[in-house]
UniProtKB/Swiss-Prot annotation:
This is OCIA domain-containing protein 1. Maintains stem cell potency. Increases STAT3 phosphorylation and controls ERK phosphorylation. May act as a scaffold, increasing STAT3 recruitment onto endosomes. The OCIA domain is necessary and sufficient for endosomal localization. Residues 217-240 have a biased composition (Basic and acidic residues). Residues 113-150, 171-198, 217-247 are annotated as: Disordered. 'Asrij' stands for 'blood' in Sanskrit as this protein is strongly expressed in blood vessels. Belongs to the OCIAD1 family. GO terms for cellular component: endosome. Its main location: other.
Length: 247
């Protein structure tokens, strides 16, 4: 044994490449025949019946007064519209049938492209089933193919865990090896800055009174008085009759 597991199934089919179908693709004679057949069948078996049915329904709705007719052309515009819608609905409803016709062609690149696209859409379920088979094969090989060297390598890769020492006494409730690494709380000595002292109403009142007294003393200070008040008055003499004169 070379130590490698072969995951390929003996009867697995190699997927064939999808042919490129572009705008410049030239269809084969068989494909042209199928195109003409699909065109005729979709017209006679789908478009004509649906167009006729839609026109009859439209005419019935107009006659009952559910749909209003044109004042000049009558019901002709609505009937033409119903016919066109029925024609395209018939063409679209025949697309699946036409695709099946192309898939049944053996030597058709277009049919091969359609088959490959359908296989790819349905491939996830098969992919998961094959994957489960591969997983079972891998587990089988791993169960029978283990060696002492592989066991030693696995032991080396596993992490080594050392037991945490616990105190032998019953009074201690925490391991001795863990408390060393517990994050300590904030130091009580390092307190926050002192909070701002609350000012009472009496203190505020005293401060206002002091400031008022200071301003009052500034007003009554002689150095601040106006010049006229500080100028000395002249002496005036008064006689016995109350008359005054200056010397």
């Amino acid at each position: 044994m070379n130590g490698r597991a072969d995951f390929r199934e003996p009867n697995a089919e190699v997927p064939r490449p999808i042919p490129h179908i572009g705008a410049d693709y030239i269809p084969t004679e068989e494909e042209r025949r199928v195109f003409a057949e699909c065109n005729d069948e979709s017209f006679w078996f789908r478009s004509v019946p649906l167009a006729a049915t839609s026109m009859l329904i439209t005419q019935g709705l107009i006659s009952k007064g559910i749909l209003s007719s044109h004042p000049k052309y009558g019901s002709i515009p609505k009937l033409i519209f119903a016919c066109i819608m029925g024609y395209f609905a018939g063409k679209l409803s025949y697309v699946k049938t036409c695709q099946e016709k192309f898939k049944n062609l053996e030597n058709s690149p277009l049919g091969e492209a359609l088959r490959s696209g359908q296989a790819r859409r349905s491939s996830p379920t098969g992919h998961y089933s094959q994957r489960s088979k591969y997983d079972s094969n891998v587990s089988g090989h791993s169960s029978f193919g283990t060696s002492p060297a592989a066991d030693n390598l696995e032991k080396e890769m596993l992490p080594h865990y050392e037991p945490i020492p616990f105190s032998a006494s019953l009074n201690e409730s925490t391991p001795t090896g863990i408390t060393d690494h517990i994050a300590q709380g904030p130091d009580p000595n390092t307190e926050e800055s002192p909070k701002r002292k609350n000012i009472t109403y009496e203190e505020l009142r005293n401060k206002n009174r002091e400031s008022y007294e200071v301003t009052l003393t500034h007003k009554t200070d002689p150095s601040v008085r106006p010049m006229q008040e500080r100028m000395p008055k002249k002496e005036v003499k008064v006689n016995k009759y109350g008359d005054t004169w200056d010397e």
